């Protein structure tokens, strides 16, 4: 049995296999074909952090596959009243076929997976957001940006950065990360990615200069400066991230056919300008839609590995 907690746990071949399956499922859906690949299966969806895209995409996805989704917030289950994660895992996993968790500390989902009898999918933790990266890379593939691409990430060294580090190191492409001083990615995760990159041929660089990162890039991406739970730091971060807005001038340093990605929600005028977000290079809504398709692919792949 396999879980989908971080891309670190998957080989390049497995990542591409899931993406190919996701593309096949997407193509079928566009033709009006909805094969019941998870007929009668139940997905338990534990949300300790709220979300728009994660809930709608997972719930729609499992229904389209012939199963059903069960939304569980902290108000609905005993986790919100202090029940240990390992107890919750041993109960819920006896009653559903798969669990998706969106939570804070990555150690929480690791503990759940340790005690779970069914596959567990990471819908987001403070350390990683792997389902989003699968959607991002599917979007890149659809635009022909998966052949030795140069990806520039500009912004906070957060869970998105960590997931980009893992994806780049596994698939062997060039990733340039630009963050303000003091906002670099987690050192342990960065070093892990560098070790994997030494085997795959990936080139990973860290800089405090957004222009250096974006120059000649095929893909430019960013994320909100203040993530959920960091609202009190919002004003300080806005000052510290001056010069890190992906505007037309910065985007103009990338290749002329470069694409712009953002996991959303986006804050116009902060991490990205209105002009770039609504411009022809922006694929943010294709990217958001691809969350649906890759998550269906992930669920089907995990379900088959369990069989």
Swiss-Prot record:
Pathway: Amino-acid biosynthesis; L-arginine biosynthesis; L-arginine from L-ornithine and carbamoyl phosphate: step 1/3
Any Pfam family matching the protein: OTCace_N
Gene Ontology terms, MF aspect: amino acid binding; ornithine carbamoyltransferase activity
Record field: catalytic activity: carbamoyl phosphate + L-ornithine = L-citrulline + phosphate + H(+)
Positions contributing to carbamoyl phosphate binding: 51-54, 78, 102, 129-132, 263-264, 291
GO biological process: arginine biosynthetic process via ornithine; citrulline biosynthetic process; L-arginine biosynthetic process
Chain ranges passing through the membrane: none
Cellular compartment(s): Cytoplasm
Amino-acid positions noted as binding L-ornithine in the UniProt annotation, renumbered to this chain: 159, 223, 227-228
EC class (word): transferase
UniProt-listed Enzyme Commission number(s): 2.1.3.3
Functional summary from the UniProt entry: Reversibly catalyzes the transfer of the carbamoyl group from carbamoyl phosphate (CP) to the N(epsilon) atom of ornithine (ORN) to produce L-citrulline.
Family from the record: Belongs to the aspartate/ornithine carbamoyltransferase superfamily. OTCase family.
Protein's name in the database: Ornithine carbamoyltransferase
Organism: Wolinella succinogenes (strain ATCC 29543 / DSM 1740 / CCUG 13145 / JCM 31913 / LMG 7466 / NCTC 11488 / FDC 602W) (Vibrio succinogenes)
């Amino acid at each position: 049995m396999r879980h989908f907690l971080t891309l670190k746990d998957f080989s390049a071949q497995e990542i591409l296999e899931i993406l190919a399956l996701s593309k096949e499922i997407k193509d079928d859906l566009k033709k009006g074909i909805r094969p019941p690949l998870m007929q009668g299966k139940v997905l338990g969806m534990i949300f300790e952090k709220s979300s728009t895209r994660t809930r709608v995409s997972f719930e729609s996805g499992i229904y389209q596959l012939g199963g059903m989704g069960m939304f569980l917030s902290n108000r609905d289950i005993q986790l919100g009243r202090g029940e240990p994660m390992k107890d919750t895992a041993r109960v819920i996993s006896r009653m559903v076929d798969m669990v998706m968790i969106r939570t804070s500390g990555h150690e929480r989902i690791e503990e759940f997976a340790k005690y779970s009898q069914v596959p567990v999918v990471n819908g987001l933790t403070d350390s990683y957001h792997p389902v989003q990266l699968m959607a991002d890379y599917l979007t890149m593939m659809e635009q022909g940006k998966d052949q030795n691409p140069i990806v520039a990430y500009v912004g906070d060294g957060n869970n998105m950065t960590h997931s980009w580090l893992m994806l780049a190191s596994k698939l062997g492409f060039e990733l340039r990360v630009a963050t303000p001083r003091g906002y670099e990615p987690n050192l342990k995760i960065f070093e892990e990615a560098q070790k994997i990159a030494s085997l795959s041929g990936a080139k990973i660089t860290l800089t405090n200069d957004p222009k250096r990162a974006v120059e000649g890039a095929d893909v430019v991406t960013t994320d909100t400066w203040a993530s959920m739970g960091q609202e009190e730091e919002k004003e300080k971060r806005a000052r510290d991230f001056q010069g890190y807005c992906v505007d037309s001038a910065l985007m103009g340093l990338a290749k002329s056919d470069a694409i712009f990605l953002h996991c959303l929600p986006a804050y116009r005028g902060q991490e990205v300008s209105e002009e770039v977000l609504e411009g022809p290079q922006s694929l943010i809504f294709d990217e958001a839609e691809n969350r649906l398709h890759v998550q269906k692919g992930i669920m089907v792949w995990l379900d088959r590995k369990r069989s």
